[in-house]
Amino acid sequence: MRKVNTNRLSEETHTSPQGRFACSEKAVSEELGRQPASTDLLELHPFDVAIVRVPPDKRNWPYHSHSAQWEFYHVISGAGKVRDEEGLTAIEAGDAFIFEPGKAHQIINDGTEQLVLYLVADNPLGGSTYYPDSQKWAVRSPERRIIRSDPLDYFDGEE
C-alpha cells in the first residue's frame, strides 16, 4: 500500500502572466507514485487525484474542454461558480459535479474565501484540450504544445 497525508503535501501554484487565472494544486496521485509523462499504464495510474485551491476573484484555468478526459469535482470548502456550455452554476461545499469529454468548463471563485476542491480525472493517453474563447488547442507529444490552425481538408498535402 502507498500512503500520503495530504495535509503535508506541498502545493504547486499556477498563475497567468496578468493574474486573471490562478490556482494551487496538491498532486496527490503523483505523491503516490503516478508518473504523468509515462505511457506505461501501471506508472500512469487509471486516474489522477488532486486537491485544487482557487483564490478569491480568480479562475482556475481558461475555459476549456478535453477530447477524451473525464473530470469529477467535489467542493471541500468555499463557494463559487462553474462556467459550462449551459452558463454559470453556483457551487458550494458538499457539491459534486462531473464533466465528460468534449464539455467545456471553468471554475470561478467569485467569493471572498479560498475555493477548495477534490479533482479526479482519468487522464487518458492521447487526449488534447480545446480552448473555445481563444480557439486554440493544447496537445501532448509528449510535451505540451499550444497550437492554432485554420481548418484543412483531410487530404491537404497528402497527394
Model-inferred region functions:
Residues M1-P46, D133-E159:
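A short, N-terminal "cap"/entry segment at the start of jelly-roll beta-barrel domains
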Residues E86-G102:
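Short acidic-glycine-tyrosine-enriched beta hairpin
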Residues E30-A37, A50-H66, P101:
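Conserved short histidine dyad/triad with adjacent acidic residue
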Residues W61, G87-T89, T129:
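Short beta-strand segments
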Residues P46-F47, I51-P55, S65-R83, A121-P124:
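Short, conserved beta-strand element in jelly-roll/cupin
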